[in-house]
Design a protein with these regions (language model features):
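Bacterial N-terminal signal peptides that target proteins for export
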Residues: 1-6
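A generic structural signal for short, solvent-exposed coil/turn residues
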Residues: 13-15, 95, 161
């Protein structure tokens, strides 16, 4: 009886893993480009999923980049905004003061997974990295839920914010410390 239970659990786990599907961007390289750096992301669509017209992925809190430096495969369009395009049912962290990058598929021919979607790039002034979130929306391929949208979220490497992005945070912290300075000086004089 125990053997049947374990075999059933293994079979259920295998079915669950087989139906798991995502669009996954991954930082593949950072290369020097003059005084800047090109951040290259490779993206893939996994099994049981397809990319259709208007499916997309967003890299949150990327920060400043060189305008017009973006490159993407044919059939994809680039956009950036402070509040990223976000698929339903996921809650990525999105700082409203840091730019997000979104690539949207505008092609008419679905890309059936598993498949490499290509390299998506943008230039920025740093090669220092940190972790942020990405989210993606694609379409279920096959089965009783064929054609329904699938959302996923995960971690991805992005540039460390420039000092200009940190300036408001440093200003607030400095102002807070300055308000404490008179109190500190009074205590020092009385002590």
């Amino acid at each position: 009886m125990r053997k049947i239970y374990i075999l059933g659990l293994v079979a259920f786990s295998a079915m669950t893993l087989a139906t798991y599907a995502d669009v996954i961007p991954t930082l593949s390289s950072i290369t020097p480009s003059g005084s800047d750096f090109t951040w290259n992301y490779s993206a893939n669509v996994t099994l049981n999923q397809r990319v259709e017209h208007d499916d997309f992925f967003t890299i949150y809190d990327f920060g400043n980049f060189v305008p017009g430096s973006n490159t993407q495969p044919a059939g994809w369009v680039f956009s950036s905004a402070l509040l990223g395009r976000t698929p339903a049912f996921v809650l990525p962290h999105d700082d409203p003061g840091i730019l997000n990058l979104t690539w949207t598929y505008i092609g008419q021919t679905p890309i059936i997974g598993p498949a490499a979607l290509g390299i998506f790039s943008v230039n920025t002034s740093t090669n220092q990295l940190r972790t942020a979130d990405f989210a993606a929306q694609a379409t279920r391929n096959g089965g009783p839920n064929d054609g329904t949208k699938i959302s996923n979220v995960g971690d991805i490497a992005v540039p460390v914010p420039e000092m200009s992005a940190l300036l408001p945070i440093l200003s607030v912290c400095s102002a807070g410390l300055l308000t404490l300075l008179p109190s500190f000086l009074r205590r020092r004089q009385t002590g």
